[in-house]
């Protein structure tokens, strides 16, 4: 489908063209939602995970991130002049020459498990900002001057009061809500009692494989980490 074939969606604002491998993707911002157009439906980015393949979902996510970034970088943060696109993923201020690139907010997420004579269990928590009543994993944003490993240990300590050991990298995932990168880890319980950070968490505790609460959707790295642990017990 070409941009020219979508003229019936106008008015729109053309933002940029992405070149990813052999793909050329046009990023546009519609002036108003599409309604009652045969064969087309407006769908939120999160819902597209169940519709698109992984490759196309990542393309859509990158497009959404750039739309957000374009909206928030229309003016130079140094001199206040309007910015102009320099490449397909960067801008430049024509007055002071400052170059602007998308900033990614890095966050960690960690699966903590412990082994007891009764078997294996996983630490799951419910954050107050969750929109649904599921339990996820300890997570938090990387702070200036921190390593990823230091961030994991700090977030676990602040949110749960626990000590961990055997910290291992698991995987990472772009998280375009609006411009994040989730870096996943696994760790073993090393000591302490669970004391939840009440400002951020409403519930939390240890769960076994046969006593699991609702967990996040498959689109998230949290679910990948949890499913990996569940599969180890099969």
Over which residues does each language-model region extend?
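Nudix hydrolase/Nudix homology domain
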Residues: 1-73, 131-135, 197-234
């Amino acid at each position: 489908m070409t941009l020219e074939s979508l003229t019936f969606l106008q008015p729109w604002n053309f933002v940029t063209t992405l070149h990813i491998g052999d793909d050329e993707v046009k990023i546009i911002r519609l002036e108003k939602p599409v309604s009652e157009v045969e064969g087309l439906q407006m769908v939120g980015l999160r819902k597209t995970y169940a519709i698109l393949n992984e490759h196309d979902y990542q393309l859509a996510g990158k497009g959404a991130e750039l739309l957000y970034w374009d909206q928030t970088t229309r003016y130079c943060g140094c001199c206040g002049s309007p910015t102009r696109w320099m490449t397909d993923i960067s801008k430049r201020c024509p007055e002071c020459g400052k170059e602007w690139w998308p900033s990614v907010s890095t966050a960690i997420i960690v699966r903590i498990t412990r082994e007891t004579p009764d078997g294996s269990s996983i630490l799951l928590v419910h954050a107050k900002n969750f929109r649904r009543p599921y339990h996820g994993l300890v997570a938090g944003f990387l702070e200036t001057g921190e390593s990823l490993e230091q961030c994991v240990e700090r977030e676990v300590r602040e949110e749960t009061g626990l000590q961990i050991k055997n910290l291992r990298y698991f995987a990472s995932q772009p998280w375009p809500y609006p411009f994040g990168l989730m870096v996943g880890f696994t760790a073993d319980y090393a000591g302490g009692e669970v004391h939840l950070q009440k400002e951020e968490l409403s519930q939390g505790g240890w769960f076994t494989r046969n006593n699991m609460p609702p967990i996040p959707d498959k689109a998230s790295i949290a679910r990948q980490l949890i499913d990996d642990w569940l599969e180890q017990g099969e």
